[in-house]
Amino acid sequence: MVDETPSLGRAEEEIQGPGARLSRRRFVAVGGLSGIAALLAACGGSSTPTTAAPTANLSAPKPTALPQLSPVASGTPAPAAQATPAAAATIGKLVLNSDPYPKYTGTPKDSDTLTMIRGGEDLSDLNPDALNSYSPYTFVYDPLLWMDEFTLNPAPWLASKWEVSADGKSYTYTLRNDIKWHDGTPLTADDVAFSMIVYRDDPESAVARFFPLMKQDPTVVDPPTVRFDLSDTSGDWVLNASNQFMLQKKQLGDYYNAGHGQNGAKTLKGFPYEQQMLIGTGPWKQVKYSPGSAPPYLQYQRNENYFQNAPHFNQMIFKTIDQSSSRLTAWLNNETDLLWPVTATDVDQVKNQDGWLYSEHALAFMCSWINFKNAKQAHPEFLNDKAVRQALSTGIDRKGYSDAIFKGFVDETKVGSIAFSWAYDTDLKNPTYDQAKAQQMLSDAGYKTDSSGKLLGKDGKPVTLDAIVANTNQYPVDKIAVSVQEDLRKLGIEMQIETLDPATLKNRWQKTFDWDLWFYSRILFAGFSDYTYYHSAWDPRTNPQGRNAGGWKNTQADTLLDQIIRQPDLTKQKALLAQFQTIIADDMPALWYGFPDDLILVKKNLLGYQPNTGWQYWDSWKIWRTS
């Protein structure tokens, strides 16, 4: 994936059942190359395909990479190492695979239709910069730079190379000369410049936070070259801004510039998406958009000219179904070929039907944010006491919910939100569950229990907590809330749980602030982008754009955050992130619940599925049907 014009198509696939392939990229990571600079400079070779039985090694170490961004991205992949097959693990009739780079042997075959179902995607509006959904854009569009499916190492994609100025403030991208839009017109630097301006300026943009340093509009040097002159060095320009989808100016430019937004704001909201199908460069051409159907769906045709080789299906249908039970019914009735997200409880319901179950690292975390400024809390000093927060964390039985809810498909020991494999401080762990120790810690902090076991505040009245959680979640934090509720009850604390629709929840965390714990999960982008969730200047009580909903303030953390977002050297950024992780593990702006695995169901007659920690449906063009 580090060639100037990479090809990850059929010629490079190693094909049969999902196995323990040690791919080119995994070889680089496991082989200990010191980082992305070494990765990009690696010399190439060719791998020899091997045939192996499907495998799953649940205890196998995951590949990591220590990123050091090279100014120029070029080079050839390192050769692949051979993998030794291990015994296949199964859950009922499901064959389990946990390799980040599965191995397949055989010959891909073309088929008619691939069907994919996912929950929680809003297909009511296809504005590509609002990102109300995500899967549809991975089908139609491509980014400038590709992030490796596990390590997140950046590599050329639509751009054949990128260069960084000596002062670290200017980025120049050279586009491949063989990229065509679905209408046959060439991709140009004008399209790239337009896309980045939209992401920066559209009031609907979900990723405007990646572009505050792009105060100047991009410079189109010539048709294949575009330059971005930033106002300062950036810690996430390559990993986040450069990984956004490129939009066609010809299709969207006139509408955007006409200013259809409030007070004449330029926006892509309201574009006639039902009449005009999105035009991209990606593996699938959109041919139908039916947001009013039950369920809502999109239909695609294969892009025969896709630069990474055409998909192995003539068409693809993508549906979104919010109810988990309905999604499982569709799977059991063979109405879908892939299903994600899937919980461990879901697996119990479908394990007697043949299929592949991929258990893959998710670029995600789970927590309950702590509200330090709940005006309705009768004991506001309670959660503001760090000793109390640490006591509550010690009193949470994480292994209990790991076994009961996740069946082990989670690393509940992980602390914080830095779920990047290259940046997480592996020395940090959540405390081991110890109810007696937690009770003693609360007592030492001045909180005693009465004869009935209720924990009393310093005013002699029982301590109670109010928790909020969304009614739809990517990961089952609503069930974690129930588990934590029982743990806190053992400490003498009653916690009420309110399950809310998204609009009501947003009003509670952004405007009324009348809660104590917000149970939460989130999928991350490739680079650190949590500045507004932690920095004290981004408290939504004073900053409408802020996401520091609990009003946490830590001066040392603020200083580190200001350094992290301006540090382009990822080795140095990793060191800063390590310090930051130590702070949030100790000072606890949240109770941390670990990093979940993604579970993806794939029909037994499908091969070629490549997990992607950034979005598990991103590599859909690699899949084929065996029969």
Q: Across the structure, where does each feature detected by a protein language model lie?
A:
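N-terminal lobe/hinge region of extracytoplasmic solute-binding protein
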Residues: 94-102, 114-166, 197, 279-285, ...
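Alpha-helical secondary-structure segments
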Residues: 115, 188-195, 223-229, 283, ...
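A structural "hinge/loop" feature
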Residues: 99-105, 118-135, 158, 185, ...
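Ligand-site clamp/hinge motif
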Residues: 176, 272, 302-349, 481-486, ...
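Surface-exposed binding/hinge segments that line
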Residues: 209-263
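Detector for C-terminal structural segments
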Residues: 33-40, 295-297, 302-304, 359-362, ...
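N-terminal secretory signal peptides
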Residues: 1-22, 26-42
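Gly/Pro-rich hinge or "lid" segments in bacterial periplasmic/extracellular proteins
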Residues: 122, 148-153, 245-310, 315, ...
